[in-house]
Amino acid sequence: GCCPPQWCGPGCTSPCC
C-alpha cells in the first residue's frame, strides 16, 4: 500500500512515495 502523504519522504520505502 501507499504511505499517507505525510509519511512520504526519508525513511518511506513505499514505491509510490
Curated annotation (Swiss-Prot):
One GO cellular component, as annotated: extracellular region
GO molecular-function terms, A-Z: toxin activity
Residue numbers carrying 4-hydroxyproline: P4, P5, P10, P15
Keyword list, A-Z: Disulfide bond, Hydroxylation, Secreted, Toxin
Cellular compartment(s): Secreted
Tissue expression from the record: Expressed by the venom duct.
Record PTM: Contains 3 disulfide bonds. They are not indicated here, since framework III presents two different connectivities (I-IV, II-V, III-VI and I-V, II-VI, III-IV).
Keyword Disulfide bond in annotation: yes
Domain notes: The cysteine framework is III (CC-C-C-CC).
UniProt similarity note: Belongs to the conotoxin M superfamily.
Protein name stated in the entry: Conotoxin Reg12a
Native organism: Conus regius
